[in-house]
Amino acid sequence: MKKIIYMQIFVTVTTLVGLSAIKKSTDTVDQMTYDWSRTFAEVLQLTNQKHYKPAVIDEAMMNAMDAFLNTLDQHSNFLKPKVYQRMMESTTGEFCGIGIVIDNTRKEKDQHLTIIDTVPGGPAEKEGIEPMDKIVEIDSKALGGISTDEITTWLKGPRGTTVTVKVMRKDKPDLLTFTLTRDVIKEQNSLSFYLKDQNIYYLALSTFSQNAVNQVEALLKQATKNKYRGVILDLRNNSGGLLNAVVDIAGMFVTKGSVIVTTKDKEGRVTNRYPTTRNPILADMPIFILINNYTASAAEILAGVLKIHAQRGSTKNLHAFLIGTKTFGKGSVQEVIPVSNNCAIKLTTSLYFLPDDTTIQGIGIEPDFVVERTMPLSEQMRWFTQNYGREETFKNHIKVHITPESTPKKPLTEGADQAAKRWSERAKELLQQDNQLRAAITLINLLGTARQCCPAQVTTREKTVQFMREHLITNDTPLTIEQVP
């Protein structure tokens, strides 16, 4: 019986490792790979025979295969049956979890999982978890060395069950513990608004799905009916999604048949080209794209493609500009390939290349206008500014008695129930304090003014960027400072 187990292990490991080896000939297996796979099988057999504790072969094999795939790159990993099943379930857009948006750019070696946002009305928000909190433990299990895919399965589960997380929060010396009851979470992939006073349309995409395609198309068709001044496309914190959705959305801006992205294998051979198949919708109006360090993968492709086509002038009347900070730099393609025992592997098989034959892998996309995000004051800083640094904070300050106008007092509970707010209501509040959004609005207004008063300054994209940089002070604008004699 042990010989049969040994041979099964040997054949499985040899096949897995053999598929990963770089070989010019497909008829033979690299001798070194063969030798080491044989050694691996021997170790398993000896462990099973001689170790004091009974070996759990299935768990050991899955961990070993995951460790092997992790040595290739941080995005390749082994999907255990439960992880693979939950991954397939989550594609429906509805699942039972705690209601958080996570940092998908996390590395497996990281000891924490950053929460980018919470779902309004979800379990996490109800219990007081905040954006940018960092989860360090889930049900007493540390996160270091665990893939993000597996961590998400720990957070998901049947409705009504509980999960306990320990959270590290900025300015808090101790870890915070939350016990959350899982509930149905309906993900919100997009939000759109109309800025009436500025006559600007705003659209935020958190991921790329077919629903996102429909939302972008509906907004652009509505915008083209009006004499709008510009569109702001918010790709901040967008970690990617469906590539065909990106191609469809790009097709709304660029000439039909334009190649959006190509993929190349490890030999540099082009494996796929993805051209647009539709006619563009956007009229002769600027589009400003907000990006940050959490803009990754498919979101980077869309930002990069629109920038390149605008620079080339290959699409008439495409005026695309990037605002914010450098993107994440994930330009690799992963395939989820089912294997036996209800498992799968997520394997990096190729790299994305933009229309100018450059890759974003490890490089990212640079914005045209660097604008760092300034966050609203923390609770501690709000208290500090209210209690210090003003005349009224002195104990014996002179008071001027002014009879205030009589105004009805608002109920104390008004606006306190944050959990009841919808996505759009909370987004409106956040956008009011968003300096990057305000920079985009300023640039749209600046471009509109330039087209009227000095159109010669904005005839090309290069000239337009130069003109706007001269008139907008951003984080990367050098200041010439001279001493007054």
Regions found by a protein language model. Give the residues of each.
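C-terminal "post-core" interaction segments
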Residues: 3-8, 20, 34, 191-485
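Bacterial Sec-dependent signal peptides at the C-terminal "C-region" and cleavage site
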Residues: 16-30
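Acidic/histidine-rich, surface-exposed loop or edge segments in extracytoplasmic proteins
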Residues: 25-28, 41-50, 199, 416-425
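Interdomain regulatory linker/hinge segments that flank or connect interaction modules
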Residues: 38-93, 158, 171, 440
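Short flexible coil/turn linkers enriched for glycine and charged/polar residues
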Residues: 92-96, 106-111, 129-130, 157-161, ...
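PDZ/PDZ-like domain segments forming the peptide/carboxylate-binding groove
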Residues: 93-137, 141-144, 210, 350
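PDZ-domain C-terminal substructure recognizer with occasional recognition of PDZ-binding tails
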Residues: 114, 136, 150-191, 348
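PDZ domains, with a preference for the canonical peptide-binding region formed by the helix
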Residues: 131-166, 245, 330-333
